[in-house]
Design a protein with these regions (language model features):
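Glycoside hydrolase catalytic-domain context in secreted enzymes
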Residues: 1-622, 636-641, 645, 759-760, ...
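Long, acidic serine/threonine- and proline-rich intrinsically disordered regions
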Residues: 661-662, 711-789
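Charged, amphipathic alpha-helical linkers/stalks
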Residues: 652-724
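Terminal connector regions
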Residues: 617-664
Length: 805
C-alpha cells in the first residue's frame, strides 16, 4: 500500500467515513489526520461545477465554463488527437475551478438510437468509442487531475436505469460493451472509473466482482479508484469488498455504520476497507497537489476557438445534390427555423454546462460574406402547429436563391433520465420543409440532434448538414462549413437506419420490466445491418466532402496495412480511412465485418500520402465462452479499407495463425446468431446463447422497487405516491417539458432514498417503507419512526466524533 503510514493511524470509523462522500460533490476530509477533501464535477463536454446548492441533475446554476461539442459530435471527427485537445482544455478549466475529478467521458455503446443520453456517448462501435475516449482521458489528465470514464457497464438506456438488470451473454459483454473501456484503461490509464446504476446479469455493477475485480482490476491492471454514479450504491459493504472505492454523494452516516457492521461481522475484511482507502488517498493527494499548483484562470477565447474548430471538424455532410455547397460569396440566402435564433447546442441533465458564451447562427452569418434577405422562425420549437409562422417562412423563402433551414430535436427530446419515443423530427418542422421546398428547391437543412433520425423527408432538401450538438461555438462552425472556410470531413459514428422499425433492438429496448434482454447479442448497429443485409439511410462511417479521394496500392499483413490516398478534388480536405476485418468462412459466428483501425489524413489538392493503419491484439480475437479466454480462429481474413462501412475501396487477404480452440458453439443450436437475423430470436435460443435460463422478470417488493412501482404494492400510501408522481410526470411531458427531477424520482429505487437525502433517511427507515408496501402498514410505520429517531441520534454522535478527528 502506498499510504499505509496514514491508514494505520485511522480507526475503523474514520476509514469507513472516508469511503463515502462528504457533500454532493466533495469527498470527506479529516483535517486532523492530514487528509483534505477534493471536488468532483460533471463534465463530459465542459466543467459543471455548481456555484450554490448542488444537485446531480444539472438543475441548479453552475460556474461559467466552455461548452465544447458533445462526445457524440466529436466522435464524428474520428480524431482522437482532437478529443485529446478538447480534454486538455476541459482539464485546464477544471483545475482552474479547483476540481480534482472530471466525471467523463461517457462511452456507453449506442445500442439503440432511442437512448435519451446518446448525445453523451461516442459510438455504436467499441473500438471507435475506446480510441476517442482514450484521447479525452489523456488530455484531461495532462493537467494532473483525474478523468472518470463512465458508465461501467452495459448501461444503454435511461428508463429504470437505477433498477434495471442488463441480461447479456459473456461474449457480447466482453467484445461489445467492455472493449471500449479496456482500450481506455490500457492506453490512457484513467485515475478513476465510474460504475453504472444498473445490474449486470443479476448483480449491481457497483458490487459486481466479475466486472470490478476479475476484469477491470485483474485482467486490465486498473489500479485507480472506482466511483459510484450518484446514488448508485446498493450494498455499500459488498461494493467495497468487490472493488468499489468511493460512494457518492454524501449518503449520510448510516452508510458508515453499515460498512463498520460488515467488518465487525466478518462480511468483509478490514483489509478490503484498507485497500479501497489506499486507492482513494492516492487519488486525493495526487489530484489535490495538481489543483493547488494550477492557475486560477484560463484563456476563454482560445478555448472558444478550439470549441469552434472541434465542432467544424465534426460536422458531417450527409447530402449535397448538385454541389449546392459550399455557398458562393454574396449568395442570396434566407434563414428559417427556431434553432437559428436559439441554438440547440448541448444535451439536458447532469452534463449541461453554463456556457461562457453561445454563438448565434444569425450573428455568425453577418461576417460570412453571404447576403441574408431575412429570418423567419417558421415553427414552434416544442412541436405545436402554427400556420402563421409557416406562412411567414414560406414567403421569405421565395425571396432567396438558397434557403438555410435550421431543424432538429428540442432540448427535452434528448435528456438524461428520459429515452426518446421515436426517431422522428416534429411534424411541424417537416410540414415547413415540404412547404418551403415547394417554392424553392435549393433547401439546405442544418440539423441539430444528438443521435440518428429517420429521414424520409430527404427528397425535400438538396443538402443536409449534420452539426449534431456543436457546443457554444457550433453556430460559427456551421457557417465555416457552409462557406467552404472548412471542408467537411466528419463521418458518422453511428448508423442511421431508414426507420426505427429496422432497428435490431426495437422489440427489447428499453424493456418492459426489471430485466433488459440484450437478445441481439453482437449485432448492434452496422454489425447487424451489414450481416443481415438490411439497407440503411446512411451507413456507419459515412460522410461527404467538398473534395474527392482516391485509394490505391494496398499492402497488407496480419499486423496492419499501408496504402496511398490522393486528394483528387478541387480543395484541401481530410479523409477518414477505415479498416474493417472480416472472415467470410468463419466457423465461430461473427458479424460480417468489424472496425479494427482507422486514420485521418489531411491532403492538399493533388497531394498523395502513404497511410499506415496498424492492427492490435483486438483485430482477430473473439471471446471463447468454453475456454473463458480470448482466442483467435486461424485462417484467411479479409482486410477491407474504405470510406465507410458500405464503401469499401480496397481489399486484401492475410493468413492469421489461430490459437487452436474449438468452436464453443459447435453443439449449440443458434441459427439466428449464425446468420445475423436476430430480430426474432426465440427464448430457447437466447437461453442457449446465455448458457443459462433467462431470468424471471417480475416486480419484487423490496429495497430496489422504484417509487413508480409502489403502485404494485399493498400500501394505500404507496399507491398515492406512485399516482401523484405519475400524474406530475405525465403533465410535464404533455407540456413538452418533462421534469427531470420528477423523472429521477419516479424511476428511483427505495434504497436510493437512503443514499440521496444527505442522511435524513436511513436504510432502516427504507426497510420500514418496504414493510408498508408489503402490507404491514402499522408495523412498517412504527419501524420508520423508530429508525428515524435512532438515525438522528446516531448521526449526531458520529459527526461529533468525526469532526474531532
Amino acid at each position: 500500500m502506498k499510504h499505509a503510514d496514514i491508514i494505520q493511524t485511522l480507526d475503523l470509523e474514520q476509514k469507513c467515513a472516508l469511503l463515502s462522500g462528504g457533500t454532493v460533490f466533495d469527498t470527506r476530509a479529516l483535517p486532523g489526520k492530514g487528509i483534505p477533501s477534493i471536488t468532483l464535477s460533471d463534465g463530459p463536454n465542459g466543467v459543471r461545477k455548481q456555484a450554490g446548492a448542488a444537485d446531480h441533475l444539472g438543475l441548479n446554476p453552475s460556474v461559467p465554463a466552455t461548452c465544447f461539442p458533445t462526445s457524440a459530435t466529436v466522435a464524428n471527427s474520428w480524431d482522437p488527437a482532437l478529443g485529446e485537445a478538447v480534454g486538455e482544455a476541459m482539464g485546464e478549466e477544471a483545475a482552474a475551478q479547483e476540481v480534482s475529478v472530471l466525471l467523463g467521458p461517457g462511452l456507453n455503446i449506442k445500442r439503440s438510437p432511442l437512448c435519451g443520453r446518446n448525445f453523451e456517448y461516442f459510438s455504436e462501435d467499441p473500438y471507435l468509442a475506446g480510441k476517442m475516449a482514450a484521447g479525452y482521458v489523456r488530455g484531461i489528465q495532462k493537467n494532473g487531475i483525474a478523468a472518470c470514464p463512465k458508465h461501467f457497464a452495459v448501461n444503454s438506456q435511461e428508463l429504470r436505469r437505477m433498477a434495471s438488470d442488463s441480461i447479456v451473454d459473456e461474449r457480447t459483454l466482453r467484445e461489445l460493451y467492455l472493449t471500449g473501456f479496456e482500450i481506455v484503461v490500457k492506453e490512457a490509464k484513467p485515475k478513476t472509473i465510474m460504475s453504472s446504476y444498473n445490474l449486470v446479469n443479476g448483480t449491481y455493477a457497483n458490487e459486481n466482482a466479475h466486472l470490478l475485480q476479475d476484469i477491470l482490476r485483474r485482467d486490465w491492471g486498473f489500479d485507480g479508484a472506482v466511483v459510484t454514479d450518484w446514488g448508485g450504491s446498493n450494498d455499500h459493504a459488498l461494493g467495497v469488498k468487490n472493488g468499489s472505492t468511493l460512494e457518492m454523494p454524501f449518503p449520510g452516516d448510516d452508510s458508515i455504520r453499515e460498512l463498520m457492521k460488515a467488518v465487525e461481522s466478518g462480511k468483509i475484511s478490514e483489509h478490503d476497507v484498507d485497500a479501497r482507502l489506499d486507492e482513494l488517498l492516492e487519488l486525493v493527494f495526487d489530484t489535490k497537489a495538481a489543483v493547488e499548483k494550477a492557475p486560477r484562470t484560463f484563456d476563454a477565447a482560445a478555448h472558444h476557438a478550439l470549441a469552434r474548430r472541434a465542432a467544424a471538424q465534426s460536422i458531417v455532410l450527409l447530402r449535397n445534390e448538385g454541389a449546392l455547397l459550399p455557398l458562393k460569396k454574396g449568395e442570396k440566402i434566407a434563414v428559417l427555423g427556431d434553432f437559428a435564433r436559439t441554438p440547440r447546442y448541448q444535451g439536458a441533465g447532469s452534463s449541461a454546462v453554463n456556457s461562457i458564451q453561445v454563438d448565434s447562427f444569425l450573428d455568425c452569418l453577418t461576417e460570412s460574406g453571404l447576403t441574408n434577405v431575412g429570418y423567419a422562425q417558421g415553427f414552434d420549437r416544442q412541436g405545436k402547429a402554427d400556420e402563421a409562422l409557416k406562412k411567414e417562412a414560406v414567403a421569405l423563402a421565395q425571396n432567396a436563391n438558397v434557403v438555410l433551414l435550421c431543424m432538429g430535436l428540442d432540448e427535452i427530446k434528448e435528456s438524461e433520465g428520459l429515452d426518446r419515443m421515436d426517431m422522428k423530427l416534429a411534424q411541424n418542422q417537416l410540414d415547413l420543409l415540404a412547404a418551403v421546398a415547394a417554392v424553392n428547391p435549393n433547401v439546405v437543412v442544418l440539423l441539430s440532434a444528438g443521435s440518428s433520425l429517420e429521414t424520409p423527408w430527404l427528397k425535400d432538401c438538396k443538402a443536409l448538414v449534420y452539426g449534431c450538438l456543436g457546443g457554444q461555438a457550433g453556430a460559427g462552425a456551421l457557417v465555416d462549413v457552409l462557406t467552404g472556410t472548412v471542408c467537411p470531413g466528419g463521418k458518422l459514428a453511428e448508423t442511421w437506419a431508414n426507420a426505427y422499425s429496422d432497428s435490431p433492438v426495437k422489440d427489447h429496448f428499453a424493456g418492459e420490466g426489471r430485466t433488459v434482454q440484450y437478445r441481439e447479442g453482437l449485432y448492434v448497429g452496422y454489425r447487424y445491418f451489414e450481416t443481415a443485409g438490411r439497407p440503411v439511410a446512411f451507413p456507419f462511417g459515412y460522410g461527404l466532402s467538398y473534395t474527392t479521394f482516391a485509394y490505391k496500392d494496398l499492402k497488407a499483413a496480419p499486423e496492419g496495412v499501408t496504402l496511398t490516398v490522393t486528394n483528387t478534388g478541387k480543395c484541401a480536405g481530410a479523409e477518414v480511412v477505415q479498416l474493417y476485418v472480416a472472415k467470410p468462412d468463419a466457423k465461430v459466428f461473427r458479424p460480417a465485418q468489424e472496425l479494427k483501425g482507422f486514420a485521418k489524413v489531411w491532403l492538399e489538392v493533388g497531394e498523395s500520402k502513404t497511410v499506415s493503419i496498424p492492427l492490435d491484439d483486438k483485430a482477430y480475437r473473439y471471446w471463447n465462452v468454453a475456454t473463458d479466454s480470448w482466442e483467435v480462429e486461424g485462417g484467411s481474413y479479409q482486410l477491407r479499407v474504405g470510406a465507410s462501412s458500405a464503401d469499401i475501396r480496397l481489399t486484401a487477404e492475410v493468413v492469421v495463425l489461430g490459437s487452436g480452440a474449438p468452436d464453443p458453439y459447435q453443439s449449440v443450436d443458434l441459427p439466428h446468431y449464425r446468420t445475423g437475423e436476430i430480430t426474432s430470436v426465440p427464448d430457447a435460443e437466447f437461453a442457449a446463447l446465455l448458457g443459462r435460463p433467462i431470468p424471471e422478470d417480475k416486480i419484487r417488493i423490496d429495497r430496489n422497487m422504484t417509487l413508480g412501482e409502489l403502485g404494485h404494492g399493498r400500501s394505500p400510501l404507496g399507491w398515492l405516491v406512485a399516482a401523484v408522481l405519475g400524474l406530475l410526470l405525465k403533465r410535464s411531458i404533455q407540456r413538452g417539458k418533462p421534469d427531470l427531477n420528477i423523472l429521477f424520482q419516479y424511476n428511483m429505487p427505495l434504497r436510493a432514498l437512503a443514499k440521496m437525502t444527505n442522511g435524513a433517511i436511513s436504510m432502516g427507515m427504507v426497510d420500514g417503507i418496504v414493510m408498508e408496501a408489503q402490507g404491514f402498514w402499522i408495523i412498517g410505520l412504527l419501524r420508520v419512526i423508530v429508525e428515524a429517531v435512532k438515525n438522528i441520534a446516531q448521526n449526531g454522535a458520529m459527526e461529533k466524533r468525526l469532526k474531532n478527528s
